[in-house]
Amino acid sequence: MALRPAKIDRYVDKPAYTRREYIRGAPGPKITIFDMGNPAGDFEFEVSLHTAEPVQIRQNALEAARQQVNRYLQKNVGRSNYHFKIRVYPFQVLRENPMATGRKADRYGNGMRRPFGKPIGLAARLKKDQKILSIRVNRQHLKFAIEGARRAAMKFPCKCYYRIYDKEGNDVTTKILSQSL
């Protein structure tokens, strides 16, 4: 069965569906690596990507963003000069009621009889202004971290924005962007 468009699953309009002990055939997570780069490193800045609206992000989009950002940072910054962390986990089980189509579909399809649906994937459920991912770097690699966050935002079905924090956790976005990188 083909992958449905992300716009179908992005809205947070249904109750949470996460209890795996009650769900038969729930798929496993596609994203398995959440920390990349050098987690023990001491870095000056953290670039975090936030959501601008409540949204569900499918695990396919999270994995695509993870691969894109990690590859970009490894190529331009080097493996030991950054720490990249995915901050959300796909708990929400997505389901679909498969509808029969084609010739004589009415003979073998069930239509809306027992329409609860079968599990087809997982999604992370996020609130407004929640962090999706964080990239910790030093000042000389800050522009690569910002570009990585921008590339990750393209993979998600919502509006995103980034913030730059210093070591103490203070928001220094306007201060840094007013200076030249």
UniProtKB/Swiss-Prot annotation:
Q: Which GO terms describe its biological process?
A: translation
A GO CC term? ribosome
- Keywords of this entry: Ribonucleoprotein, Ribosomal protein
Q: Which Gene3D superfamilies match?
A: Ribosomal protein L10e/L16
Q: Is this entry keyworded Ribosomal protein?
A: yes
Single annotated GO MF: structural constituent of ribosome
Q: Does the keyword Ribonucleoprotein apply?
A: yes
Subunit structure as annotated in this protein's UniProt entry: Part of the 50S ribosomal subunit.
Tell me which NCBIfam families the record gives.
PRK04199.1-2, PRK04199.1-4
Instruction: Tell me which family the UniProt entry assigns to this protein.
Output: Belongs to the universal ribosomal protein uL16 family.
UniProt-listed PANTHER family = 60S RIBOSOMAL PROTEIN L10
Q: What is this protein called?
A: Large ribosomal subunit protein uL16
Protein species of origin: Pyrococcus furiosus (strain ATCC 43587 / DSM 3638 / JCM 8422 / Vc1)
